[in-house]
């Protein structure tokens, strides 16, 4: 499945960084070499004096490993509520602030379980942070490259 493949690639990149993990880290103070801590600073800014945003590829890989299964499961629960998407000729999905495109992982899971069917999938993801999520987008494109049901993939920029 897509999610397992992307988690594996993100984990491999994140695990292989060792000492250079924070090479591109914009932390103003000494870095803890722990992207989970930086993610906490992003998600709970009131708990810290260090202002962080999604601004590091290492953090993006850590994020996908830590949160993708949880977020994909929430998307699956939500998508199951909409009967009209279960059998579509063209399934059109737009994600604003798509980040690592976890919607595609949820759709891939539902497709593999026979919960939805489509002949074509048009996915448009809008997110200005290509420099942060780009490795994951490339991994997704590689995974989906042989699937002729996918078209119209866009993951970056302002459309």
Can you say where each PLM-predicted feature lies in the sequence?
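S-adenosyl-L-methionine
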Residues: 133-159
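Conserved class I S-adenosyl-L-methionine
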Residues: 89-99
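Conserved SAM-binding motif I beta-strand of class I
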Residues: 122-127
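N-terminal auxiliary segments of SAM/dcSAM-dependent transferases
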Residues: 1-45
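Active-site catalytic pocket residues across diverse enzymes, especially alpha/beta-hydrolases
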Residues: 82-83, 111-115, 140, 144
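Conserved SAM-binding loop of SAM-dependent methyltransferases across substrates and taxa
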Residues: 100-117
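Class I SAM-dependent methyltransferase Rossmann-like catalytic core
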Residues: 48-85
């Amino acid at each position: 499945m897509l999610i397992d493949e992307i988690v594996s690639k993100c984990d491999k990149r994140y695990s292989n960084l060792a000492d250079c993990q924070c090479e591109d880290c914009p932390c103003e103070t000494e870095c803890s070499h722990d992207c989970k801590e930086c993610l906490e600073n992003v998600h709970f800014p009131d708990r810290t004096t260090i202002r962080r945003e999604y601004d590091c590829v290492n953090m993006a890989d850590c994020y996908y490993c830590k949160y993708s299964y949880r977020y994909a499961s929430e998307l699956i629960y939500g998508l199951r509520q909409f009967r009209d998407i279960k059998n579509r000729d063209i399934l059109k999905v737009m994600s604003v602030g798509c980040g690592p495109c976890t919607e595609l992982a949820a759709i891939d899971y539902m497709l593999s379980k026979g919960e939805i069917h489509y002949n074509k999938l048009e996915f448009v993801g809008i997110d200005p942070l290509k420099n942060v999520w780009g490795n994951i987008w490339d991994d997704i494109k590689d995974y989906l490259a042989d699937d002729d049901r996918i078209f119209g993939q866009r993951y970056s920029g302002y459309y």
